[in-house]
UniProtKB/Swiss-Prot annotation:
Family per similarity comment: Belongs to the mitochondrion-specific ribosomal protein mL53 family.
Primary localisation category: mitochondrion
Keyword Ribosomal protein assigned: yes
Region named Disordered: 99-118
Source organism per UniProt: Mus musculus (Mouse)
GO cellular component: mitochondrial inner membrane; mitochondrial large ribosomal subunit; mitochondrion
Any single biological process term in GO: mitochondrial translation
Localization, UniProt: Mitochondrion
Record keywords: Mitochondrion, Ribonucleoprotein, Ribosomal protein, Transit peptide
Protein name: Large ribosomal subunit protein mL53
Pfam families assigned to the protein according to its UniProt record, in alphabetical order: MRP_L53
Subunit-level organization: Component of the mitochondrial ribosome large subunit (39S) which comprises a 16S rRNA and about 50 distinct proteins.
Length: 118
């Protein structure tokens, strides 16, 4: 898990929402994922990224919802995933988003719904 933590950077991530019921038996990996993502070392990679813990007592399935800056959304159902699987999936999507941002010209990039007229 240390290797996944070392390469985890939240630069392209806008929001991480972790939702779980603490009284269910299958939430340990989701809670560990939340601890990892909300650590100071990981949070320092993007100070504009919000990490939200949504703790409910409704018996709901643990869920991790990651919103990237380009509008892409990653939803992981944590009931049958290990912490390592969730971290490696997030790291893989972050690498893909970084590669997509690097290949697109930065000056010509316009957010959807905006115009370039001044």
């Amino acid at each position: 898990m240390a290797a996944a933590l070392a390469r985890l950077g939240l630069r392209p991530v806008k929001l991480v929402r972790v939702q779980f019921c603490p009284f269910e038996k299958n939430v340990e990996s989701t809670r560990t994922f939340l601890q990892t993502v909300s650590s100071e070392k990981v949070r320092a990679t993007n100070l504009n990224c919000s990490v939200i813990a949504d703790v409910r007592h409704d018996g709901s399935e643990p869920c991790v919802d990651v919103l990237f800056g380009d509008g892409y959304r990653l939803i992981m159902r944590g009931a049958h995933l290990t912490t390592q699987e969730m971290l490696s999936a997030l790291a893989s999507h972050i690498r893909d988003r970084n590669a997509a941002a690097a290949s697109a010209p930065g000056a010509d990039k316009v957010a959807p719904g905006t115009s370039t007229r001044r």
